[in-house]
Amino acid sequence: MWFIVYILLALPIMLFVFLSCEWPKRNDAEQIEWSSGVPFLGNAHQMGKTPAEILNTFFEFWHKYNKDNFRIWIGYYANILVSNPKHLEVIMNSTTLIEKLDIYDMLHPWLGEGLLTSKGSKWHKHRKMITPTFHFNILQDFHQVMNENSAKFIKRLKEVSAGDNIIDFQDETHYLTLDAICDTAMGVTINAIEKRDTVDVVKAFKDMCHIINMRAFRPLQRSDFLYRFSPEYATYAKTLKTLKDFTNDIIAKRIKVHRTAAAKTNQEGSEFSRKKMLPDTLLSATIDGRPLNQQEIYEEVSTFMFEGHDTTTSGVAFAGYILSRFPEEQRKLYEEQQAVMGNELNRDATFQEISAMKYLDLFIKEAQRVYPSVPFIGRYTDKDYNIHGTIMPKGTTLNLGIIVLGYDDRVFEEPHRFYPERFEKQKPGPFEYVPFSAGPRNCIGQKFALLELKTVISKLVRTFEVLPAVDELVSKDGNLNTYVGLPKEEKERKERMGYKYDPILSAVLTLKSENGLHLRLR
């Protein structure tokens, strides 16, 4: 009883202190166009109830404010969507503006302070320590494992797509990418593709991403303390336990392998010393003259389990979906496979052959333009920043709009047209196309992700003809059948047409389709 009384008495004081600190920011950011909201909620009530509605609202605001930076308020938290390439260049190249936004604090119970969420000197030291794990030579070693996992994936697809069945390609891809990150960077085999019915961690990844995204746009749920009293907390706690148990099991298995191998030989050039997986690197590393503790190892392994699995799922799934809608581009990919591999299309493509597939590279680039795996990147201003005359006030959330760049007709001509050759004929500026971010906090695993993407798509087009869920959905004009990036009126027109198999895009940390990505394989 007294606890409740104390809380009720403290709330007005806390609100006064909070508003005293936060209200001046509204004046500091006035030069940026903004959408008026209501007291206490700001624009939170306008954002929508689902991740898909939130993404659509961002695009509607972007069109409303002439495709430039704009500001919204979530409660009294200032949020600026940055879509100006000149501003993005300054922000991404900054060596001081590298703090991730405060929303990432909600990831700490799960990921701790790994590369995704850490800041300052810890981030710099850990980034330097982990970088060798994704060295060019190690990627070549990983490639054969990627081929083996792709073969298992193809076998699974043959089974579920038999009889012209419509399959959810997005759902199937989750298990492929989980196997890939475990078998390569983690050095642990879990056989998720073959044992999918017993792998509950995939659902846990999906649930946690959804939970974090919804909390971000509900001001009261941002507080860990208040969130404990929400009806969703029980699901969150169960999901968190599943994810943490899975990561700790991965670490325990690799510790056993690490100790056994180290006991057999410590000779330079041995298989063990030459081919270290991420957990091995962490177990052997020192920071400031000391070994990493158990929590630090957990943080980096859990971070790479999430980023290496979830972002690549998005990339592979949307690339497969695009194949189903664009038969001409699929034909060009197949012809390139023949040109590079000759008549031996049933064997694995080598690392060198994948590297020689230039149209495949263009296809992946264009797929990442229209469906970037990470649609937004967050930064947090720890002081006032003057960026080309625009003040970004201290304590502001910056949402770097990777996805909106791809639909900006000032950067890409006919942005709703899927046209891989655009990257051959007119290359965008270095900060007009940034699907893997740029600058000091760029994606450390981008070469790994691209190699996996190319390996899977190469094998897919050599094995199947990829078809849409229904024949009518083949693109006849080269344009994407998607609502994202469209002005409100055009989006509503397409919705009335009722294409139930068109993706309903949502930004749940990574890009997903709420209704799956459906296609057929023949």
Swiss-Prot record:
**Which enzyme class?**
oxidoreductase
The principal location of this protein is mitochondrion
Q: Which domain of life is it from?
A: Eukaryota
Cofactor(s) annotated in UniProt: heme
The answer to keyword Transit peptide applying to this record is yes
Q: Does the keyword Thylakoid apply?
A: no
Residues the record lists as binding heme: E307, C443
List the protein's name.
Cytochrome P450 4e5, mitochondrial
